[in-house]
Amino acid sequence: MPRYYCDYCDTYLTHDSPSVRKQHNAGYKHKANVRSYYQQFEEQQTQSLIDQRIKEHLGQTAAFQQVGAAYNQHLVSFPGNPPRPRLPVLPTPGMPVAGSAPLPMNSPLVPGMRPPVLPRPVPGAPGYMPAPGMPSMMAPPGAPSMPMPPLNSLPRPPTMNVPPAVPGSTSTPTSGGAPSMMTQPMYQANPAGPTSGGFDSFNINAQGPEANH
């Protein structure tokens, strides 16, 4: 009787019958051999795909290198091999443009540019005028000292309108136009009554004129 040969297990079965084949195919050894057999082909196919991708990548890299080498040779062919031009730097709003004339002193400011901040001049410095209404207190070096101007020549501050005086108060304006402190009568919570006669004497005095009539 012929025997059955299993290609996966590389062995001969004892009998060539359907029951024996089914029993052999259900065994764990046969399943493991089938799994390893197909896994071997998967690994080979995967490795071949990886090698193909690597070759394609190397071919693209070689093409890029050839293009770069041709471009470098084209640059070297120029006389003097001038460097590549750089991008221009745009000036900021406050930066003066190279090659342009400076702005005059009385010209309007450029929009977006902050006006220059000048230091505060020292009083009495040469070239600076004193503030309006205030005489210069310091003399230039080497000049004789000037006398102090009288206080009456200085401008006085404007006076403020004072509200009308309260009845019973007195206010006397001073020479400068400023009112003096007003004296108001003090308010008494409990005024003192008459010492003699008490409440009856007060009523008698109040009804006296009516009795005379």
Swiss-Prot record:
Gene3D superfamilies: Classic Zinc Finger (3.30.160.60). Residues 143-166 have a biased composition (Pro residues). It comes from the Eukaryota. It is found in: Nucleus. A zinc finger (Matrin-type) spans 4-36. Residues 143-213 are annotated as: Disordered. SMART domains: ZnF_U1. It holds the Pfam family zf-U1. GO terms for molecular function: mRNA binding; pre-mRNA 5'-splice site binding; U1 snRNA binding; zinc ion binding. InterPro entries: Matrin/U1-C_Znf_C2H2, Matrin/U1-like-C_Znf_C2H2, U1-CZ_Znf_C2H2, U1_snRNP-C, Znf_C2H2_sf. Keywords: Metal-binding, Nucleus, Ribonucleoprotein, RNA-binding, Zinc, Zinc-finger. Component of the spliceosomal U1 snRNP, which is essential for recognition of the pre-mRNA 5' splice-site and the subsequent assembly of the spliceosome. U1-C is directly involved in initial 5' splice-site recognition for both constitutive and regulated alternative splicing. The interaction with the 5' splice-site seems to precede base-pairing between the pre-mRNA and the U1 snRNA. Stimulates commitment or early (E) complex formation by stabilizing the base pairing of the 5' end of the U1 snRNA and the 5' splice-site region. Belongs to the U1 small nuclear ribonucleoprotein C family. This is U1 small nuclear ribonucleoprotein C. The lineage of its organism: Eukaryota, Viridiplantae, Streptophyta, Embryophyta, Tracheophyta.
